[in-house]
């Protein structure tokens, strides 16, 4: 029996050694690749200092209205993710994409992810980039919560909200969130470069899968994906989302015009996703919605329709 236990112990140690060796090799490879990839990662917009950490704001176009794009949780490259849609709007309007801490070209920073802090950082970043309200907000997914809060707290700053399959507070009463252990494990895996061994993950990103980017932009997108996946800020947002959503829910529905583009809900772990969003928008004083037959990244799947409908809606404001 002792011999068996001893052999099991040796086997466990051997497996642990192999695992640690794999992690070390992965991390070394990741570090080298990050250094190489840094040569192509030049921010296309302006970098501003907010709460002692650099944030990236990309601005394109000009016009009477300023459209602010707000990325969903975990989107590694908001500027490229939204490109298919804002490039169809920037000939008529000014477009701004704010990349939160831990996203895109913005630095990962030890900052709270409560909704008040995130909103003030977004507003400050826009101000420092030379932009002034009012804005038309284009939030995707989780940023729907921040957009609604913005309209609740500063209604004079918001002309309208055009939601890209946006989350509303009620969905987080049902939405299954990953555990602390799972967030820590996936975050560690991303930081040591294990994601590089699974290229299908980045290849399945909507902007790439829908072929919305040039070959050079795809290269930049991949580099940002490997650098900014499951960052500390992204994981902290997930940790705080139920509290943030509850805070927005308490304040009711803001009185601003809204237009929701709603996905088929099949990529989301909430059975009644579509109904949640439809019920919400039907309670809005000036509210419209469009049911789409595609996945969660609606702006990559159907940018032509969304751009056309958004222009009509904005011109009626």
PLM feature spans:
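Active-site loop/oxyanion-hole signature of alpha/beta-hydrolase fold enzymes
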Residues: 97-138
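Catalytic histidine-centered segment of alpha/beta-hydrolase-like enzymes
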Residues: 291-303
